Amino acid sequence: MPRFVDRVVIHTWAGSGGNGCASIHRSKFKPLGGPDGGNGGRGGSVVFVVDPHVHTLLDFHFRPHITAPSGKQGMGNNRDGAAGADLEVKVPDGTVVLDEDGRLLADLVGAGTRFQAAAGGRGGLGNAALASRTRKVPGFALLGEQGESRDLTLELKSVADVGLIGFPSAGKSSLVSVISAAKPKIADYPFTTLVPNLGVVSVGEHAFTVADVPGLIPGASAGRGLGLDFLRHIERCAVLVHVVDCTSVEPGRDPILDIAALEAELAAYTPTLQGDTTLGDFAERPRAVVLNKIDVPDARELAEFVCDNIAAERGWPVFSVSTVTRENLQSLIFGLWQMISAYHAARSEPAPGRSLIRPVPVDDSGFTVEPDGQGGFVVTGTRPERWIHQTNFDNAEAVGYLADRLARLGVEDELLRVGAQPGCTVSIGGMTFDWEPQKPAGHPVAMSGRGTDARLESTDPVGTAERKVARHQRHKHGG
């Protein structure tokens, strides 16, 4: 069973809104008190919340389907339905949210950072909210909207100050184990490290974090080996450290060539977070080189030979260390701390508690009418499609109200303009019907006054004598 998961695809469904209620107020001496149907409750949203106690996406690996509760239906006596509670989903610090096309939606960094992954549907209006001067007693209510449904990709990118990069078996895990309290798996075969390991390094009263990630090989930027699984974990690192094995006897391998090969892979990799100004350009992050395993005599000679060449060619600090004898480890720790401090001092500190969130633009102001190629037309637009989903097509009044709304929006005028003929098929939001125009093009829309009741129109007071006659008639018919 996997213990560390850093990339998952999840399916989120927000709760649907509750339906509105169509009811008439009735009480003693007031049998027709007007509409009093309440509105439906809003559906619950799916919200990601950063929890510092969560360190992996393992839970989503086994439970990728996330559904928020729906809102309740409205009731009579102007009682609104209860809203569905938002479903808060805990994610690790450093989680990146991508849409189906791989576009970055949110970069969640910092405890308590929130992101609404799927919005709950709006509740339908009750007939009390739909009443107007021309529609005094609506005999219908609106249906609740469906909650948003989205397929998202979550990627966990380690939040560390220093990222150790190097070929497999270069000694990265050993280095982390001796400069911090971390205990990664250490062995003498390639790809011993299959998941990132984080260690905290103390520097006097200060501390910084180091990420030990799987080994890198040529072609990693194209996905070879552990490839992209490795590279995304160094995107947030302030300092990148090349860990070079000075004991390697493989043909075509030496410290200078190893560094060049690793830099070629980094140059070919395009970070997801490259637009985040708080991190800076990935290619310009400060680098350092650690020449490891100098406790071996031949390795020490090689390190002394290439040290000045690397510093002169690259301009990076070079540290020759041994994790066995712990030689020069303190110099390495203080050198890395100075590089981290200089990096952060040169950059403006981001506001606390903020995250990179890129909302998807939504245009709900207009609509389009296009022929469907079979003599009919398709109307697309946020508002017309939403109105279709709010309509109960078993209720003639509700259908008439929909026709009024579409006419006010200009859908009917546009259909006439593009040549739609009475009786042709029109599709809106998955609903297809035969279109019949309500008015000539260009004429103002006359509201139909649907839902009126003549008994509510009278404003003349009823006299005592008339009430006595009415009561006598009721008693007479009653027996």
Curated annotation (Swiss-Prot):
Keywords: Cytoplasm, GTP-binding, Hydrolase, Magnesium, Metal-binding, Nucleotide-binding. Residues 359-437 form the OCT domain. Disulfide bonds: none annotated. Residues 160-341 form the OBG-type G domain. It is found in: Cytoplasm. GO terms for molecular function: GTP binding; GTPase activity; magnesium ion binding. This is GTPase Obg. It comes from Mycobacterium leprae (strain TN).
